[in-house]
Amino acid sequence: MTDSFPVTVFHNPACGTSRNVLAMVEAAGYRPEVVEYLKTGWDADQLRGLFAEAGLTPREALREKEARTAAPELLEAGAGDAAILAAMAEHPILVNRPIVKTPKGAALCRPSERVFDLLERRPETFVKEDGEVV
């Protein structure tokens, strides 16, 4: 991470979008703090603060694909924020990724190009894993 402009990437190395975002940050010259949240886990307060900073509700940050198998009750309309946060703390895979935090704010970086809004500089060109040039 650069001293004057810290970048934190909440990262899942199995996710192509997350890998692209991390590579974009590094290509822009940053050395980010990488948090592999599947290993470190979350707590509800940490998630609440991160989502508030990113302007997300817990439901908006919920990865529905994983919720279908890990916690299908969260997909019901009556599932509240507290239940979603508790499930995310218990099953970190339920949090959509990647989330990036910088002095400019925090965001769920889907699509991956959203990360550029959080950086002071960007690479001149970047080629994603799938060959797309951004």
Outline where the language-model segments fall.
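Local sequence-structure signature of Cys/Sec-based thiol-disulfide redox active-site neighborhoods
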Residues: T2-A28, P32-T40
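Thiol/selenol-based redox catalytic cores and closely related redox-interacting motifs
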Residues: K39-V134
